[in-house]
A protein has these predicted regions:
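Alpha-helical transmembrane segments of multi-pass inner-membrane proteins
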Residues: 24-27, 78-82, 116-150, 156-291
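Transmembrane signal-anchor hairpin modules in multi-pass inner-membrane enzymes, especially those
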Residues: 1-85, 116-119, 123, 178-187, ...
Length: 412
């Protein structure tokens, strides 16, 4: 294999070798570094301009309908500058969106003909995911042991934990797709898949879990359709719908909790708490939640009385958990169980959206919908999107703090 790979690389023109380098930087940079990603785009565009085979580029572009749709969307954003008042922001936003066009352009206009070189790029992609995830996990475990980190979302050192979680799911999909093609490396492939599945589970990134589920589900369905197993496909679809319905029921059906003022000895709790912690009883925890409410719910989750004796029975680790905003002992666990209880708390108990990813996103979506209703034909223009959100948040007297008043979507 390595001899074939070496021969394929040797047969490339110098511009082809530069283009391959650019693609390698893209495949590594999309996982680990914006700098490498930007460098790959610059080198890639430069190699295309040096080769100057514009006729061949145009043929490839015309043959790819998906890329044509991307160009149309980008052009519509550009045209919206005509009715944008904040031109500097609009130009900045278009510059950021350029990567959505440039990266597909580099992959489409000069496709690699060698399967070995394609596999090399995918190997770089998966290797970057494995190495970065191992570093993330090791650093997180060390920081946890030193009480320097209290939120699993801080585990990603490569930018957004949501974006990284989705990339990990794609990496698993690549490994599964090439499982049968790697006869000599099946054991290694199984180890890599197992590690990345564990990382996805442990990191609690809901977008990553959903992406992994979709990849496995659609991949399995397409495989069974190819094998003409229609009845099995129908059974899997029905089973998936039932499980999805059960999960939604488990999340959204509320639990009954006792009222904090009627069933809690707040005076006794405050006296014992002041001995155990430096955080004032009437203050907020590290997730900006009312600390005494976090304490009551944490005591409930451990089946302890809401009084001074219950507080005294808490361990030092429990005290740190409460200070860090964990309202349920189950939230301190790893994986889906912790995420499940965290989501239930957000849906049924949390009154302040700050510090809660789901509630912050729902609040932003609500503001975005109201902006859309006011400008449903032409929009506000790409330059005025951020300003429109600022005005809408003020108009609605949003509970979101200024640093959390973001636009309602991520560009991926």
């Amino acid at each position: 294999m390595f001899k074939i790979l070496r021969d394929d690389f040797s047969n490339l023109k110098w511009t082809g070798k530069v283009h391959l380098l650019a693609l390698a930087l893209l495949f590594v940079g999309v996982v680990t570094s914006k700098f490498l990603l930007s460098l790959g785009m610059i080198i890639g565009v430069g190699s295309l301009l040096m080769e100057r085979d514009f006729k061949a580029y145009w043929i490839e572009i015309r043959a790819n309908r998906f890329f044509l749709y991307l160009i149309i969307i980008y052009l519509l954003c550009f045209i919206s500058l005509l009715w944008s008042q904040n031109l500097p922001y609009g130009l900045h936003d278009l510059r950021v969106k350029t990567s959505l066009v440039v990266i597909p352009l580099l992959l489409i206009v000069k496709p690699l003909k060698s399967n070995q070189l394609k596999n090399l790029l995918l190997l770089l992609f998966v290797s970057s995911i494995v190495i970065s995830s191992l570093i993330n996990f090791a650093v997180y475990q060390y920081a946890m042991s030193k009480d320097a980190i209290y939120d699993v979302r801080q585990m990603s050192l490569c930018g957004s934990h949501i974006r990284y979680g989705i990339i990990v799911a794609f990496g698993i999909g690549v490994c599964v797709h090439y499982y049968n093609a790697l006869d000599k490396y099946k054991f290694t492939n199984v180890v890599v898949i197992s590690w990345l599945v564990f990382y996805t589970y442990y990191s609690q990134v809901l977008a990553g879990l959903i992406s992994l589920f979709i990849i496995i589900f659609l991949g399995g369905i397409l495989y069974l359709i190819k094998k003409k197993k229609e009845k099995l496909v129908l059974g899997i679809v029905l089973f998936t719908l039932i499980i999805t319905g059960f999960c939604c029921y488990a999340l959204f059906v509320p639990e009954t909790h006792k009222n904090i003022s009627e069933h809690s000895d707040l005076v006794g709790m405050e006296k014992s708490w002041s001995v155990r912690s430096t955080y004032p009883f009437d203050s907020i925890d590290n997730k900006n939640q009312i600390l005494k409410e976090t304490l009551v719910r944490y005591l409930d989750s451990k089946a302890l009385a809401n009084d001074s004796i219950g507080v005294e029975k808490l361990s030092e680790k429990d005290i740190r958990n409460i200070e860090n905003g964990y309202a349920d002992i189950h939230e301190t666990e790893s994986g889906l169980i912790a995420r499940y209880y965290g989501l239930r708390y957000q849906i049924h108990e949390a009154k302040n959206p700050n510090g809660h990813s789901l509630l912050q996103r729902l609040s932003s979506w609500s503001s975005a919908w109201n902006i859309t209703k006011d400008h449903w034909i032409m929009g506000v223009g790409v330059g005025d999107v951020a300003d429109a959100f600022v005005l809408q948040y003020e108009k609605e007297h949003s509970l979101l703090r200024e640093e959390n008043r973001l636009r309602a979507h991520n560009n991926y």
